[in-house]
């Protein structure tokens, strides 16, 4: 651990545990100055959450009228990032875990003046292969890794939580706007999400930011890659993404028709 990182962690911990501060301003990065919950991953506040190269490429995709689906929105990082550019479009943020939803709502309230056109819509359910009720793990020690995939290697003994879920294709049929970009970070359920978006992928060909989780479900990465290649997508592995857990990989996926 470098000295700066140590000092930043120490500063956050003192403010959280000694001074009982629930929120601090983010130190650096694209969300510098945003107020953020101190109980979340400290990398958010340090401005080091997610890979810089990935963020740059995603920002190049975003336009003022983009429709952005944030699947596995957690506490809102990518939704806030997209909102910096999307002025006339819409951001659907999907997050089923109540604790994350509560923090996301507090971030919306605390950063209200920074949010352009109030276009972030928080959807409190999961996205999967079909409309159904799924049972999530609800482990507070695994706040960013809870999943409904029964075979997950990380599904530790914990409380369970029933949540509603729906597919992307069903959502569009029921009035949700067609996505231009879909971010998928759903802890091993990414293949289910793709299965529930077959029509959308074939007809509308949205761009994808896909996180695969072999750490949850061994082989899920190759399964998703093969699925998308059959659908005509070209994938780019983000080599510079610094993942702390083996089996986590990020991909940018664009349909071949959009490259010509």
Report residues per predicted region:
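Conserved phosphate-coordination/catalytic loops
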Residues: 48-52, 159-166, 188
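Conserved Rossmann-like nucleotide-binding pocket used by diverse enzymes
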Residues: 69, 92, 123, 164, ...
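Short, glycine/acidic-enriched loop or turn micro-motifs at the edges of active sites
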Residues: 73-75, 98, 127-129, 186-188, ...
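Conserved acidic-Pro-Pro-aromatic motif
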Residues: 89-93, 170-260
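Acceptor-substrate binding/catalytic loop of class I
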Residues: 99, 158-163, 210-219
């Amino acid at each position: 651990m470098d000295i700066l990182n140590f000092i930043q962690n120490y500063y956050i911990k003192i403010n959280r545990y000694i001074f009982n501060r629930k929120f601090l301003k983010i130190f650096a990065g694209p969300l510098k100055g945003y107020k953020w919950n101190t109980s979340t991953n400290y990398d958010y506040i340090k401005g080091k959450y997610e890979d810089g190269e990935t963020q740059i490429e995603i920002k190049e995709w975003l336009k003022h009228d983009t429709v952005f689906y944030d699947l596995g929105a957690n506490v809102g990082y990518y939704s806030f990032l997209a909102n910096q550019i999307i002025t006339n479009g819409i951001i659907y943020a999907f997050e089923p875990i109540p604790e994350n939803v509560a923090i996301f709502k507090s971030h919306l309230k605390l950063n209200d003046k920074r949010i352009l056109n109030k276009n972030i819509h928080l959807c409190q359910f999961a996205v999967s292969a079909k409309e159904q009720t799924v049972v999530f793990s609800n482990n507070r020690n695994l706040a960013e890794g809870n999943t409904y995939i029964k075979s997950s290697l990380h599904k530790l003994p914990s409380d369970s939580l029933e949540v509603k879920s729906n597919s992307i294709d069903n959502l569009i049929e029921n009035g949700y706007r067609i996505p231009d970009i879909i971010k998928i970070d759903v802890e091993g359920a990414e293949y289910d999400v793709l299965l529930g978006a077959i029509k959308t992928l074939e007809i509308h060909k949205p761009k994808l930011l896909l996180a695969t989780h072999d750490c949850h479900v061994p082989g899920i990465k190759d399964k998703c890659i093969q699925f998308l290649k059959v659908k005509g997508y070209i994938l780019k592995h983000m080599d510079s993404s610094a993942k702390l857990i083996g089996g986590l990989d990020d991909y940018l996926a664009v349909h071949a028709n959009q490259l010509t």
